[in-house]
């Protein structure tokens, strides 16, 4: 039941992030990002047997990256990475 509530909250949050337009500040519009600057490699670990099985399932079905400001089109928000980064995932094809 707790998993269902957590997954529902994540889905609703991801939906809200995708539907809300993000307002750029003057500072953000004046700075240029270097290609690949947003992409960061991340290692995620879960404790216990159940967490290990969940991690294996997620790693097979999803490709996840850490992004600076928002997830790209086709990606969903799946939590945070180290620091201010967002964990954005998409399904494997």
Swiss-Prot record:
Propeptide regions on this chain: 20-58
Entries under Pfam families matching the protein: Defensin_propep
Subcellular location: Secreted
One GO CC annotation: extracellular space
InterPro entries, per database record: Alpha-defensin (IPR016327), Alpha-defensin_N (IPR002366), Beta/alpha-defensin_C (IPR006080)
GO process terms (BP): defense response to bacterium
Summary of the function given for this chain in its UniProt record: May have microbicidal activities.
PANTHER family reported in the protein's UniProt record: ALPHA-DEFENSIN 1, ALPHA-DEFENSIN 1-RELATED
Name of the featured protein: Alpha-defensin 22
Taxonomic lineage of the native organism: Eukaryota, Metazoa, Chordata, Craniata, Vertebrata
